[in-house]
A protein has these predicted regions:
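Juxtamembrane helix-entry segments on the extracytoplasmic side of multipass membrane proteins
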Residues: 7-11, 35-43, 68-73, 146-168, ...
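Helix-helix packing/entry segments at the starts of transmembrane helices
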Residues: 19-20, 44, 103-109, 178-199, ...
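Specific transmembrane alpha-helical segments of multi-pass solute transporters/efflux pumps
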Residues: 26, 60-107, 143, 223-243
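Transmembrane alpha-helical segments that form core, pore/gating elements
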Residues: 27-30, 53, 114-116, 120, ...
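C-terminal-most transmembrane helix of multi-pass membrane proteins
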Residues: 46, 146-147, 218-220, 252-321
């Protein structure tokens, strides 16, 4: 059993790995646009993840959980898979119009969509502090993208921003459906079922034959996209073992900053100049990014505090009964 210091260091390590790999992912996805369409690449990522995770779950002997699922559980599982397919595919598509850092920052509206989903479907409450953070995310987005307002004629960027919102909304619906399945399946089995479902459903719409003509560099990029899916989610799951959910969520909110830094490093070293370019963000845009990240972190902190208060209020009632 690790002590408190080891627990903190393990949590920090796995959270950092998660942020690093999620920060690198949009760069790799943008590079993949030169040799693969978003649907085919997403199909490949799901297929590789399904094989790796399937072998892992089979070795652990936990596949028997699926035998206990009812019809409505399977329907929820397939619906969650459909939303995750939309999430993966649309985010990859958005990178045809946005820089990696901008796409990751735009995705920070996901907590708002998740909260609204909880409000409408799970009857959860959003307090005024959370609403204030959501307003902060919106204001930060406007400040970050302020050069676009000044330039005008940047319709493709707004189109990309809209695609990211679709991706974030789809991810939020996936997260809500996944939450409803936690009592029936382990999170790893939920992901496995979704990966296999996506592998089958997306095959008619993808062109795997196009992957056979990839160059050596293209193969490395595609392989990284696939392995990234496994490593990032694996590190995220491990981080959740050692840190509280709010700590992990707050650290993951730094992903846009990581994506921005990595993009600028690629530009500084002259890597992939045909695909990766600098955002040329000014001080005001960087301030907008800071507002978005700070607001996203505060949403997690406030939500955790609300949950703790609710648990403390419920405890005396339970003891009284």
């Amino acid at each position: 059993m690790p002590n408190a210091k080891q627990t903190f260091l393990y949590g920090l390590f796995f959270s950092s790995i998660t942020v690093l790999f999620w920060g690198m992912l949009p760069i790799a996805l943008k590079l993949s646009g030169g040799f693969s369409d978003p649907i085919t690449l997403t199909w490949l990522r799901f297929s590789v993840a399904a094989v790796i995770l399937g072998l892992w779950q089979w070795q652990r002997g936990v596949l028997g959980e699926f035998k206990a699922l009812a019809r409505k559980d399977w329907l929820r599982l397939f619906a969650a898979g459909t939303f995750l397919i939309v999430n993966y595919t649309s985010f990859a598509w958005s990178l045809n119009f946005l820089l990696p850092g901008s796409a990751q920052l735009s995705f920070q509206v996901a907590p708002l969509f998740l909260a609204l989903g909880g409000l409408f479907f799970l009857k959860e409450v959003i307090n005024w502090q959370q609403w204030l953070c959501f307003v902060g995310i919106g204001v930060g987005m406007l400040v970050f993208f302020h050069p676009i307002f000044a330039q005008g004629g940047q319709g493709s960027i707004w189109f990309g921003f809209g695609i990211v919102q679709l991706s974030a909304a789809a991810w939020s619906m996936y997260a809500l459906l996944q939450k409803s399945l936690f009592k029936r399946l382990a999170p790893s089995n939920i992901l496995l079922a979704i990966y296999v479902y996506a592998l089958v459903v997306m095959l008619p719409f993808s062109t795997p034959s196009a992957l056979l003509s990839m160059s050596a560099d293209d193969i490395w990029i595609a392989a990284f996209c696939c392995i990234n899916t496994v490593i990032a989610y694996g590190a995220f799951a491990q981080a959740m073992r050692y840190w509280q959910t709010v700590q992990v969520s707050a650290s993951v909110a730094l992903t846009p900053v990581m994506a921005f830094i990595l993009t600028e490093l690629c530009v500084a070293f002259g890597w992939w100049t045909d695909s990766i370019s600098s955002s040329h963000a000014d001080i005001l845009s960087l301030f907008g990014m800071l507002i978005v990240v700070a607001s996203a972190i505060n949403v997690q902190l406030i939500s955790a505090r609300v949950q703790r208060k609710a648990a403390l209020l419920a405890k005396p009632l339970t003891e009284a009964v």
